[in-house]
Amino acid sequence: TFNNLTVLPDMSMVKKLGKLDCAYNKIKTIEKAFGRDVNLVQLSMDHNLIEELPRDENGSFCGYADVESFSFAYNKLKKFPNIFSSQSVYVMSSVNFSFNEIDGFEGEEDGTFKGVNANTIAIGGNKLKKFPTILFKTNSQVSALGLNGNGIEEIPKGTFSASKYSYMMKTLDLTYNKLSKLPDDFNGRNMPFLYGVDVSNNRFTEVPTGPMDAATLTVYAVRSQRDENGNRLLRKWPSNISLCPSLRQFCIGGNDLRKITDTISSYIIVFEIKDNPNISLNLSNVCNMIKAGAYLLIY
């Protein structure tokens, strides 16, 4: 870490290697794949200049039997590498390819992409202009998916109904994209265990109601919806917010909400409405909770 290494030498002979941290170097080349006999537990190659990952004769970069963290954030990769498999019996804790130059997936066009089996997949800060439906088509098993800051304009219809593992999804970060709507299959029927969804800094004119179908939805953020010129887009209050039984935190600041006639649910104990210049609402039913410190109002 924090050196001037430009080439990672062949380490395939180090069969018992478990942790490797080469972050903050100047690595452009990985000389040779570790191979599937090297089962890394933690690999950090963040903040380098890596453009591609080598493979062994079996198409493997390394072994994945005990992976906790596998990170290539802040590099120069152009494609999400086809080195994992959604059918693997081993579940990786986290896979991080954030802040590269990724605009697609290896094997997506010819149908050879094998998917991913990981609790968390982070690919924010890349160049994915279209939603990565390939993860769902290949039945990738993921609980938390980070797609922030990609400029994604659309999520194709049928994305979440196409996978038999959509029900595993719990957390979605879709902030800083260009979405204006969510497909009908983005709902609690396909993702019944959704915990948190953040669609802040997009282009919605109304609060998407699909995620509210999930009985477990606890955190929902729809902050700062703007058009390409920076104009505020969201003015309408979601009428069915009271139908979300588990919602405890609702963040809708930075919009242009007007008069709200709906009764604010006392179950929402963190309510953020700051930077809505024209907002008007009645909070009398939660005043006692605010005084008691049991309700956090951010305005």
Task: Label each region the model flagged.
Residues 3, 22-25, 48, 72-75, ...:
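Consensus "Asn ladder" position of solenoid repeat domains
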Residues 5, 17, 27, 40, ...:
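Conserved hydrophobic position(s) of the canonical leucine-rich repeat
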Residues 8-11, 30, 53-56, 80, ...:
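Canonical leucine-rich repeat
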Residues 11-13, 33-36, 57-62, 84-86, ...:
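Hydrophobic anchor residues at the C-terminal helix/turn of individual leucine-rich repeat
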Residues 18-22, 41-45, 68-72, 92-97, ...:
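Conserved hydrophobic beta-strand positions in leucine-rich repeat
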Residues 36-39, 62-68, 86-93, 114-119, ...:
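Surface-exposed loop/turn motifs in large extracellular/passenger domains
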Residues 55-59, 104-108, 221-231:
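Acidic/polar low-complexity surface segments
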Residues 195, 200, 216-232, 243-251, ...:
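C-terminal capping region of solenoid repeat domains
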